[in-house]
């Protein structure tokens, strides 16, 4: 759902398990959130910090 999250994860060379660990989730839980887009505010904040990106960019749904 959020292509920029996946793109930044790939740029950082991180696996789904590594990102899930930072967020305090299971790998499957993180993958489900990627599909549904249902991240908590705290998880969004952690992803923005981890990838050094702004919220608007990281969670953009436009092409």
Regions picked out by a protein language model, each given a short descriptive name:
Residues 6, 31-32, 59:
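Key DNA-contacting residues within the recognition helix of helix-turn-helix
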Residues 25-39:
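Recognition helix of helix-turn-helix/homeodomain-like DNA-binding domains
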Residues 18-20:
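Short alpha-helical "recognition helix" segments of helix-turn-helix
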Residues 9, 34-35, 43, 62:
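DNA major-groove recognition helix of helix-turn-helix
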Residues 11, 22, 50:
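Residues within the alpha-helical elements of helix-turn-helix
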Residues 43-57:
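DNA major-groove recognition helix of helix-turn-helix/homeodomain DNA-binding modules
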Residues 1-13:
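A short, Lys/Arg-rich alpha-helix, primarily the initiator
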């Amino acid at each position: 759902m959020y292509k920029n999250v996946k793109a930044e994860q790939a740029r950082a060379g991180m696996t789904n398990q590594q990102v899930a660990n930072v967020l305090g989730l299971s790998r499957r839980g993180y993958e489900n959130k990627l599909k549904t887009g249902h991240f908590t505010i705290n998880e969004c904040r952690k992803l923005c910090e981890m990838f050094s990106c702004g919220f608007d960019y990281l969670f953009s749904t436009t092409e």
